[in-house]
Amino acid sequence: MGEARGQPGFAWGKIPKNPSLPPKKNLFYTFSTHTQQPSKFTPRLLPSNLLPSSSAPLLPLTPASLCTASEYKLIVPCAFLFRKRFGKNNVILSDIRKPPDDVFYNGPFIYSDILDYKNLREIVVNNRITWLFHYSALLSAVGEANVPLARAVNITGLHNILDIAAEHSLRLFVPSTIGAFGPTSPRNPTPDLCIQRPRTIYGVSKVHAELMGEYYHYRYGLDFRCLRYPGIISADSQPGGGTTDYAVQIFHDAIKNGQFQCNLKSDTRLPMMYIDDCLKATLAVMEAPAASLSMRTYNISAMSFSPEELVQEVKKHIPELQVTYNVDAVRQAIADSWPMNFDDSNARRDWGWKHDFDLSELVTTMFNILGSDSRVAQIN
């Protein structure tokens, strides 16, 4: 992915002052191409809305961010990156699950559920949040196995976030995915603007998120920003059942026993990206001046390859790797409906997107991280 994994939850934190940001009284950017002024957002009528305010709202000394997270693969590295850049105690990570030790002791951690609107709203208010990163979603194959849960997390959770972001004038980031396209979309390359028509609940919910975010931008002035992630490859997490997870599984299996069974056809080409590039792009689009954004949802890409091409690159490190293909019909049908290659020229032009990792560098990096005490180290 571009696919979020696991259960709903979130992370948040305070982001230090950026000299490119406007004065404190307006800590978010808005951008609109139409001539009408955005309408004022009317918040949900919770009991607290009916009570008079005792004082004017307080603005934070520096921007603050809240990240909803459904998985550790993306949100934990994102939180760690922000902590390194902005301070350990300025980013608070949260989930509905008990965190592992390395997450818990790395910085502040609290509990929250993306479906609990009142609790999320209290967190935004109590911590004076100004940036929000919304990652909660069930990924493609998992979502197909539990459509009601995917509908609740991916759509109802999004509605909670949109309302909170609009009410409190937040800068909102929502990741989208290659799964937002369908079999009638142009596949090679796939432009930012084209017919989508996905055939998974995950993809449908992501198109819904893109369009709702754009609607809230034009209707209420919400500073909505979205990136369509390709398949994301990381050494820091185990594969989680996604259609592109074969590209992570191959490294673990190659190191463990020198054998790999691929659940996609050998020539199935999909756009991919190393996680460091994914995090780099996410931070870059959030820091980009609003005036530089010509659209609200951008494709980003780094490389495109097939399982066979990945296998050949892996064999440069483990020549004796044995590969078999046992195609999973569900995952193959999903992959066949997705882009083969992303056109990300708008992101490169508008806010200077540039990837760092190609296929060779990705494979070498994965083995350097995973293989230091393994078969790779013995071979080398």
Per-region residue spans from a language model:
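N-terminal Rossmann/SDR dinucleotide-binding element
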Residues: 2-4, 9, 15-23, 32-35, ...
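SDR active-site strand-loop-helix element
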Residues: 68, 94, 132-136, 172-178, ...
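Active-site YXXXK catalytic motif of short-chain dehydrogenase/reductase
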Residues: 72, 154, 202, 206
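Conserved catalytic-core motifs of eukaryotic protein kinase domains, centered on the activation segment
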Residues: 103-105, 142-149, 183-188, 238
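NAD(P)H-binding glycine-rich loop region in Rossmannoid oxidoreductase-like domains
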Residues: 114-153, 164
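Conserved Rossmann-fold NAD(P)-dependent oxidoreductase catalytic core, especially the SDR/UDP-sugar
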Residues: 128, 134, 152, 159-201
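NAD(P)-dependent short-chain dehydrogenase/reductase
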Residues: 211-270, 275-279, 283-284
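C-terminal substrate-binding subdomain of Rossmann-fold SDR/epimerase-dehydratase oxidoreductases
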Residues: 263-266, 270-380
